[in-house]
Amino acid sequence: MADFETDEASSKSESPEQEGQGSEDKSLLHQRLAIRELIDTEVSYLHTLRLCTSDIRGHLQQLPPGDLDILFSNIDDIIQVSSRFLHGLQETACKEEKQAHLIGNLFLEFQEELEQVYKVYCANYDQALLLVKAYQKEPELQKEIQGIIEAAVPQAGPSGLSFLLVIPLQRITKYPLLLQKILENTPADASAHPVLQRATSALQDVNSNINEYKMRKEVALKYTKVEQLSLRERLARINTHTLSKKTTRLSQLLKQEAGLVPRTEDKEFDDLEERFQWVSLCVTELKSNVAAYMDNLEAFLCFRPHERNLDIPGGAAEQYCSLARDLQLQAFLQFKQRLTGLVWQPLCSLARALVGPQNLIKKRLDKLLDFERVEEKLLDVGSVTYEEEAARHTYQALNSLIVAELPQFNHLVMQWLGQILRTFVVLQRDLADQVLRRAESSMALLPHRHVSEPDFQKLLEDTLGQSSSQLRHFRESFEKVLPPSTSQPLLPGSEHQMQSLLTRYGPGKIYQVTSNINGTGTLDLTLPRGQIVALLQNKDTKGNNSRWLVDTGGHRGYVPAGKLQLYHPINPSEKEPRRQTGMPEDYWLPTPEPTQPSVPTVPTMSQVVAVYPFVARSTHELSLQAGQPVTILEAQDKKGNPEWSLVEANGQRGYVPSNFLARTPSPTPRGWNLPS
């Protein structure tokens, strides 16, 4: 009996130590079980993701184009990160004593990568669900999708696609719970405890950041949608709330412009917006230039001289026709197709991609006005309504999203733009190589084939220079003897415009469009044949004298100089009817007369004479006698004043009053000859 009592007392004295040891062993066991659960579930999770990409996504090619990208989003990036993460988890198994510590460090190491890949997937999840609901409305398609999923993942059940798509969301939210479970079974004095605490907090922050990013993307998606609404639909959306909101914003803007309230300054956003606008301008200009290039290419391909009968049998002409036909049907056609597919279509897609950020930036300015008004009220009153607080958060979310993603967007657009330009250059080089390769057999017929490239370039420049000089000489010679070109009939209702331009600029600046002009640039004008314009400058801002700056009386812009001719006066026989228009007698508008083929007419040429005598008062002026013929060099002085004209008479030049001059017709004798 005494021995039994002694043993009982001994067992009671040892029980606290045994209980402590048993509790520690139990916590360690639970910790290892939690770690095992983390690793095993990660293996199963990664296996399911790989099934989604290989056995399911690969067999859903019957879905509309682009749907697979929305459904599975960036699942490939998630698989890549999870594979490396699982490899790190499995490597910790060989060090059981430090395994919990190593797992905590591993989560901290992968914190940023996990957030980056999962936030993209979670932000696109709602759009994927909308597609799933759309498929459910098509029984045949839904049955086919369900069969593919059940064959690959039987545990998906009737949920099918929805079951698979939600798995990544469940996984990222489960990481903090698994870490918390490991942390609870880790002694507070263990070295792994603070590391696990930081890892648990970090994964909780990851989930919070993902939720915040998803909310920002939802706000952005709301304002980046481009709706094609009719005027009636737009008017139907106007209500008292809309009018009140617009009025409040306008009032806030006017107070800022008047300096009554300060304007919120955000240099970071301003710099990003300026960069974005510059990038957008580059895309717009390149698209405009490529469009003009393709129009010119189309016009070039319409001309097919090799299909004409040149009446030159055999020889170089026949070989040229064969080469031109070959290039037209193969090389040029292939170049056009590649240009459309590799340059034009990507450029159009890039231009469309700019619309969303542009709308977002515009909406951000509206929300900024709401935010500033709410901030003022918060300072004055100390509280705001629920709607005002929501408007405040909307601006903050929108601004944070733009500031975070616009730099990356600008960088991607510039990369895309550079790739398009490089592709365009490569296409040009390929076309040149292809043409040279096809023309190699014809090069033996060229007279200068043995000349070096620098010498050939100089020879070409000299030949073109001589031809240009000869053509200029011919033109000047013909202009001296040919009668003035017949002006085109005025457009209906343009008499008043003609009167206005003539009064403002004088007759020496009035030109008429000889053929239709289609403007291609932002500063180019589109004008019909017969349009009257006034010359402002005979060159553009780059000094190019083939583009003239003109005034139509309503718009100003550039037109090709070759499609303009000086507006000439008409015969005196038409002067009498013309006086009824109220114009001065010295200027006559052309009126077309019916031609009479049976009665030959004598061509007339007009000359300018001095109507009154004029005595020069300085060396800049020229003395004239009444009836003395003169040549008008400029119908205005150096300041553009049309009241004085620069003339030449008897080899001398000087200024005379413009109203002292008049044009008189002089008949040209029959049989006038061309210059020899």
UniProtKB/Swiss-Prot annotation:
One of its GO terms (cellular component) is cytoplasm. Residues 506-569, 603-666 form the SH3 domain. Residues 30-213 form the DH domain. InterPro entries: AH/BAR_dom_sf (IPR027267), ARHGEF37_SH3_2 (IPR035636), ARHGEF37_SH3_C1 (IPR035823), BAR_dom (IPR004148), DBL_dom_sf (IPR035899), DH_dom (IPR000219), Dynamin-Rho_GEF (IPR051492), SH3-like_dom_sf (IPR036028). It comes from the Eukaryota. Pfam families: RhoGEF (PF00621), SH3_2 (PF07653), SH3_9 (PF14604). Gene3D superfamilies: Arfaptin homology (AH) domain/BAR domain, Dbl homology (DH) domain, SH3 Domains. SMART domains: BAR, RhoGEF, SH3. The keyword Repeat applies. Keywords: Guanine-nucleotide releasing factor, Repeat, SH3 domain. Residues 1-26, 568-601, 657-676 are annotated as: Disordered. Residues 254-455 form the BAR domain. The keyword Repeat applies. GO terms for molecular function: guanyl-nucleotide exchange factor activity. May act as a guanine nucleotide exchange factor (GEF). PANTHER family: NUCLEAR FUSION PROTEIN FUS2 (PTHR22834), RHO GUANINE NUCLEOTIDE EXCHANGE FACTOR 37 (PTHR22834:SF9). This is Rho guanine nucleotide exchange factor 37. It comes from Rattus norvegicus. The gene is Arhgef37.
